[in-house]
């Protein structure tokens, strides 16, 4: 299986990489949060742009991205607008969503974008090609904050992302029971062993699913999300605790 290298970080080998989400509402908070995050132990910085109030002002968005890039130049920067339908803060049109991601790609300030699988097949394929032409990696994602589908459906979605040439397919699901967590882990393992030719990221959310955020190296998830301050999704634990557990499991 091939790995994905962003800056000096190799994703898809060794312990799962830690992603943290920065969710600032304006440029002043982007600056202050970035300074606080700089001291934390993580691997990838995700900027959750859907929390940013001045979204319609592309210059403002890119000015904020520039602050993040300059404050943490060594960290891979993942640009993510999470749509309202997949658990994000704002709803925008598909056209605006694609335009926003293209502006981020054009800027040269971001290393990766998050692209939601169910944006529309043609738009997704075109945006992946556009990103790759500009040397930007694509995390293709799907989130369900209500339920966990059957393992076959989880695998089908991850395989579809792979067929659309995502660098890293990602799925996050809400368990209604502990057995839903096992479904997610079993699907992850089957995907990793039988179909994946690149790193994948999977997680089961909330307290019930916390084990999935820790056991990625065992079952085949290449990265996990931790919290520096406020969690960006239910079930995230602090980056320091997360690094400790991931290291213990890696060295066992």
Curated annotation (Swiss-Prot):
Function: Involved in the third step of the chorismate pathway, which leads to the biosynthesis of aromatic amino acids. Catalyzes the cis-dehydration of 3-dehydroquinate (DHQ) and introduces the first double bond of the aromatic ring to yield 3-dehydroshikimate.
Keywords: Amino-acid biosynthesis, Aromatic amino acid biosynthesis, Lyase, Schiff base
Protein family (similarity comment): Belongs to the type-I 3-dehydroquinase family.
Active site: 143 (proton donor/acceptor), 170 (schiff-base intermediate with substrate)
GO molecular function, one term: 3-dehydroquinate dehydratase activity
One BP term from GO: amino acid biosynthetic process
Enzyme Commission designation: 4.2.1.10
Protein name: 3-dehydroquinate dehydratase
Organism ancestry: Bacteria, Pseudomonadati, Pseudomonadota, Gammaproteobacteria, Enterobacterales
Gene name per UniProt: aroD
Amino-acid positions noted as binding 3-dehydroquinate in the UniProt annotation, renumbered to this chain: 21, 46-48, 82, 213, 232, 236
InterPro entries: 3-dehydroquinate_DH_AS, Aldolase_TIM, DHquinase_I, Type-I_3-dehydroquinase
């Amino acid at each position: 299986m091939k790995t994905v290298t962003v800056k000096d970080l190799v994703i898809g080998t060794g312990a799962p990489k830690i992603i943290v989400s920065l969710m600032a509402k304006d440029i002043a908070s982007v600056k202050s949060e970035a300074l606080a995050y700089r001291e934390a132990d993580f691997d990838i910085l995700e900027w959750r742009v859907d929390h940013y109030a001045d979204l319609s002002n592309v210059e403002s968005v890119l000015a904020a991205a520039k602050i993040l890039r300059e404050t943490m130049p060594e960290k891979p920067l993942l640009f993510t607008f999470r749509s309202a339908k997949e658990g994000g803060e704002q709803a925008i049109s598909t056209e605006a969503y694609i335009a926003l991601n293209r502006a981020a790609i054009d800027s040269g300030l971001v290393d990766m974008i998050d692209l939601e699988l169910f944006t529309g097949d043609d738009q997704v394929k075109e945006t992946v090609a556009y990103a790759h032409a500009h040397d930007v990696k694509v995390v293709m994602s799907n989130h369900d904050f209500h339920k966990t589908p059957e393992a076959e459906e989880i695998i089908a979605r991850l395989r579809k992302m792979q067929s659309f040439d995502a660098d890293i397919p990602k799925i996050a699901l809400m368990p209604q029971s502990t057995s839903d967590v096992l479904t997610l882990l079993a699907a992850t393992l089957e995907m990793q062993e039988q179909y994946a030719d690149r790193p994948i990221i999977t997680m089961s959310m909330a307290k019930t699913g916390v084990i999935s955020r820790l056991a990625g190296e065992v079952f085949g998830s290449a990265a996990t999300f931790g919290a520096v301050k406020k969690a960006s999704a239910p079930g995230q634990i602090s980056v320091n605790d997360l690094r400790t557990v991931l290291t213990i499991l890696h060295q066992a």
